[in-house]
């Protein structure tokens, strides 16, 4: 039995996906992907599945997401899902389709929040006093 493990990251959220042969069940934190709320997050999560088409019907994918907020978790899960589908099938045409549609389905967004600097640490990383010339 073929098993594939993939990881997707976004900000502080980390999603780990495990893909194996099955009946096409996709679960996020043990919940079926269809009942994930709110709907706009569900729509973003369904993009790789819709683009892949019938290929997904023979794959069971379990995704576990930790850390971050709701949108960061959605992006991390989406990346892990896309990577799992491509790696399990080994289909380069599907990989090109994902990259052409949206690069973040396969490649994690490397941007992270900037650490706050000393002295004005509660106000943000680049906070300065406003300067008056007159």
Swiss-Prot record:
One of its GO terms (molecular function) is RNA binding. Residues 109-134 are annotated as: Disordered. SUPFAM superfamilies: Ribosomal protein S5 domain 2-like. Residues 118-134 have a biased composition (Basic residues). GO terms for biological process: maturation of SSU-rRNA from tricistronic rRNA transcript (SSU-rRNA, 5.8S rRNA, LSU-rRNA); translation. One of its GO terms (cellular component) is cytosolic small ribosomal subunit. Keywords: Ribonucleoprotein, Ribosomal protein. It comes from the Archaea. Pfam families: Ribosomal_S9. Belongs to the universal ribosomal protein uS9 family. NCBIfam families: PRK00474.1, uS9_arch. This is Small ribosomal subunit protein uS9. It comes from Methanococcus aeolicus (strain ATCC BAA-1280 / DSM 17508 / OCM 812 / Nankai-3).
């Amino acid at each position: 039995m073929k098993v594939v493990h993939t990881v997707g990251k976004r900000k502080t959220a980390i999603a780990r996906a495990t893909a194996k042969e099955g009946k096409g069940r996709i679960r996020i934190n043990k919940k079926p992907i269809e009942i994930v709320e709110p709907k706009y997050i569900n729509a973003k999560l369904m993009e790789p599945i819709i683009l892949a088409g019938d290929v997904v019907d023979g794959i069971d994918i379990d995704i576990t997401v930790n850390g971050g907020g709701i949108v960061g978790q959605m992006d991390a899960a989406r990346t892990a899902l896309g990577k799992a589908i491509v790696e399990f099938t080994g289909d380069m045409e599907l990989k090109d389709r994902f990259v052409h549609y949206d690069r973040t389905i396969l490649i994690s967004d490397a941007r992270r929040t900037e650490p706050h600097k000393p002295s004005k640490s509660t106000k943000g990383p680049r906070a300065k006093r406003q300067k008056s010339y007159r």
